[in-house]
Amino acid sequence: MTDTDQQITPADATIVSTGTGTKGPEERELPESLSNDMSLCLRILRDVLGEYDPQLLATFDTVRNYAVKASAEHFAGATADPHPDEDGLAKAVATIDAMNLHDAQLLARAFATYFHLANLSEENYRVSVLHQRENQVEDDEAVDPVNELTTAYHQLLTEMGPAKAKALLEKLEFHPVFTAHPTEARRKAVEGKIRRIAELLEENKRLGGSDKKENVRRLYNEIDALFRTSPIALKKPTPVEEADTILDIFDNTLFTTIPKVYHRFNDWLLGDKAGLEQPQCPTFFHPGSWIGSDRDGNPNVTAKVSRQVARKFSDHVIGALEEATRTVGRNLTMESETTPASAELKSLWSHQKEMSERLTDKAALISTKELHRAVMLVMADRLRYTIERDADLMYHSCDDFIADLQVVQRSLAEAGAKRSAYGPLQDLIWQAQTFGFHMVEMEFRQHSVVHARALEDIREHGLHGERGELQPMTHEVLDTFRALGAIQKRNGIKAARRYIISFTKSAQNVRDVYELNRLAFSHPEDVPVIDVIPLFEQLEDLQNCVNVLEEIVKIPEVQARLKATGNKMEVMLGYSDSSKDAGPTTATLALHSAESRIVAWAAKHDIDLTLFHGRGGAVGRGGGPANRAVLAQPKGSVNCRFKLTEQGEVIFARYGNPVLAIRHLESVAAATLLQSAPSVEKTNTEMTEKYAQMTEVLDNASHERFLDLLNTPDFAPWFSIVTPLTEVGLLPIGSRPAKRGLGAKSLDDLRTIPWVFSWAQARINLAAWYGLGSACEKFGDLDTLREAYEEWPLFSTFIDNIEMSLAKTDERIAKMYLALGDDENLSKKVLDEMKLTTKWVLKIVNDEWPLQHRHVLGQAIRIRSPYVDALSVTQVLALRSLRKKVDKEELSKSQQAGFIYLILCTVSGVAAGLQNTG
C-alpha cells in the first residue's frame, strides 16, 4: 500500500503460519430467501463497482476469493475441504499491499458497503421468519408462541395463580435508557440509505414484471449512492444533533410500535372480549435518555445543550401527539343519535368553549352533531398551542391531556361504541401515557470529582465570587441544576428528575449533589425535585457498595425522597469500567455478588429497589441478549422492573425495524416477568450456592491473570500500538471524547468503549474473555464446569457470550496486529490466553469449533469472516505503513490524512462486519 509509489516492505507483510486443524462439515447453505437477497445485493454491488472502475471490481473479486479460501484455516472443523488454500491470506495481503492509497480507500468502502447490504438482508430475513411464525399460530393455542410475553405470563399463572400473577403484571416496567455513547460507527446518511434499500428488498419479493424491473432499478440507484457516500462523517455530531437518533427511532418505530406491543398482549389477555373491554395490559415501557444530559467526561454537554435537547424532544412528541389526536378525532364520526355524548363529555365541551369559542366554533363547523369528534379536534389544537406555549390555550401537563382523552373514551364506551373506545383512541392514550410531553426522561450524569471540586471552589471563593472568581466548571455545574429545574417546570417532574453520580465512592458524593442543587437557587421553592442515583462501577466500589448505601439512606434528602416515593430507590451498576478494571470474569461475578448483597440490604430496610444496569453493546461491556441477562439475575434483583442502557449499534439493531422492535420489547418484558417466577428464583438461588466454590476459584485466578497482563511493563503504550486506539478516537461517531476530561494519562483514564472497540478491531476481543482460560485451567474440573453451564443461567449466559466473542476473533489476523508492537512477551501472553480460553470454552459447551451448535449465528459469522479479513488486512497494513512513515517524517499532511481516512473506512467496515463496536 503506497501513499504515492512507496510500498510496505515484504517484512512488514509477513504472515505467521498458524498451522492446520481438524475440519468439519462444509458450510451450510443459506435459507433460500436470504440467499436470494444477498445474491441480488452482491450482483448489484459488483455491477456498481464495475461501472465505477473495472479495475476496482477486479481487485474486489480477487481479494474476496483469496479471503474466502483462506478463512477455512481459521474455522477449524468448519469445512470438509482437506486441502484449504493456506496461502490465501498471504495472497490477499500481497494484493492489498500493491495498491496505492486511493485504490485501497475505494476497496475498503466496497467491502464496507457489502457488510451493510449483508446486514440488512439478514435483518429482512429475521423479519420474514417472524411473519411466517405468526402465520402458523393457531387461534386455539393456550399461548402465542411468537409472543414470549404470553408464554411468560402463562407460566406465572400456572406457578402462582391468577391473583399473584396479576399483581406482578401490574408492577411490570421496562426502562431502556438511550445513550450517546459513541459506539455506532455508521453515519446517519448511511443509515438512511440502508433503510431505503431494506424497504426495496422487501418489496422486491412481492413484485413482478415491470414493477419488479422498476424496483431493481431503484435498488441500483440506492446501492450506487451507498457506495459513493463516504462512510465517515465530515465532523463529529453535536449533542443536540445526537438527539436525532432518538427522534429517528421515535418516528420510525417507537411511537407506532408501543401500542402494537400492548394490543398484542392485551388481545391474548382478553381473548374474545378484546376491543370490547377496558384493556388490562399495563403501560410498562418507560424510555429514558442520557443524550444531551450525560456530561461525565463530555464538555460539549452544557446546561444550554440540555435545555435545547429537552425542548427538541418535547416539541417533537407533542407534535406527534397532535397529529395522532387529529387523526383519531377525524375518524370519530359517530353522530349524536347513534352515539350520544355523556354528560362528562358535554361538560368538557363546555369547558373548551369557555377557553376558546374560536376553537370550538371551528371544530363544530367541521363536526356538526359529532361531539366526540369536535372535542378531539379542539384537543389537537390545544396541543399545537402547547408547543407555542400559549398560556391560555395550552395543556399545562400531559396528565390533563390524558384525562381529556379518557373522558372521550368513557363517553364512547357508555354509548356502546366500545370498539371505537378501545381501538385507535386507546393507542393514543397508551402513547400519551408512555411518552408524555417529554418523549424520554432525561437523566443527568456527572463525575463525583466534578461535584467535589465545584464545592471546594465555592467554599474558597464564595457562592457569588465574593472572594474571587469561580471556575467556569463551577458555574456550569450550578447552571446544570438550573437547567434541570427549567426542564421540570416546562415538561413536568417526570421529564428530568434522576441525577446519576459516576464513580460513587462514598455517601459524601450524594450529599455533594443535593448541596449543589440547593446552592444553585436563591429561593427554596425553585429547587427541583431530584433522585440522586449512585453509580458503582469499579471492582473496589462494587465490593464496598452496601457500606456506602448504608450511609446514603441516612442523608435527610434521601430519607425525604424515600418517604415521598413509597420507599423507592435506584442504584446503578456499571459493567464497563468493572470489566476494564478487573477483567470480564471477575467483573461478571462481582456484579452478581453486588446485586445479591444490595437486594438483601434493600429488603432489610424495606426499600423498593430498582437496579439500573449500565451495559454496553459488546460482551466486554456487559452486552449480549438482554432477555437472557434478565433471567440470569439474582433472586429479588429484578422484581418485575428492568432498567438498562441502550447505545450505539444496539439502538439501531433492537429498535430500527418495527417488527424486530416488537420482538425485542416482548422478549425483554417476558424475561422481566418470568424472573420473578418461583421456579426461576429457586434455580438462580440454588445454583449460586452450589457453584460458590467454583466461582471463587474462577474469580481469583482470572483476576490474577488479567492484572498480570495490565501490570506488565509498557502495556499501555503497547496496547495503543497494536490496536487502532488512536485512530478510533478520531472517528466522528459521537460528541464524547475517548478519554475523560480529568487528565487522561493511562488506561485508568481511558473510557471503556475505545478499550473494547480497539480490541475488537484487532480481531482479538480481549476485553470479553481474557483470564477465563487460566481460571478454568486452575479449577480443572471439567465435569463441574459443564454442569454449571447446563444448570446455572448466569454461567451459561456468560460462557455463550464469550463463545460468540471468540468466534469473531482470528489468530492469523491478531498476529499481524500484535506484530506492530514488537513485544514477544506481551504478544505471547495474549495468544496463549486466547488459545487456552478457546480450548476450555469449547470443552465446556462440547463444541469442536466456536458456535458449532448455534448454527444460525455461527454460519453468519463464518460467511462474514473472509470479508472482515480483507478489511482487517487493509487496516493493519495501513497502520504499519502510517506509523513507520510518520516516524521517518516521510508523509505530507495530505498523505497522512489519506492514511487516516483509509483506516477510519476500515474501522467502520469492520464494525459493520462484526456487528458490534463498544
Question: What residue spans do the PLM features occupy?
Answer:
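Often metal-dependent polyanion-binding catalytic scaffolds in large enzymes
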Residues: T2-H464, M473, I530, G623, ...
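Active-site-proximal structural scaffolding
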Residues: M38, L56, A104, A243, ...
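Conserved alpha/beta core surface patches that mediate binding of polyanionic ligands
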Residues: L269-P287, D479, V510-E515, N547-V558, ...
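Catalytic or ion-translocation cores adjacent to nucleophile or general acid/base/metal-coordination motifs
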Residues: V301-L332, A520-N700, E704
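Active-site cores of enzymes that catalyze phosphoryl transfer or operate on phosphate-rich substrates
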Residues: S367, R373-L377, A417, Y422, ...
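Short, surface-exposed connector motifs at secondary-structure boundaries
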Residues: R410, N491-R498, V529-D531, D608
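Ligand-binding clefts of soluble mixed alpha/beta catalytic domains
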Residues: V571, A603, T645-D781
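C-terminal accessory/interaction regions of large nucleic acid-associated machines
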Residues: S720-G918
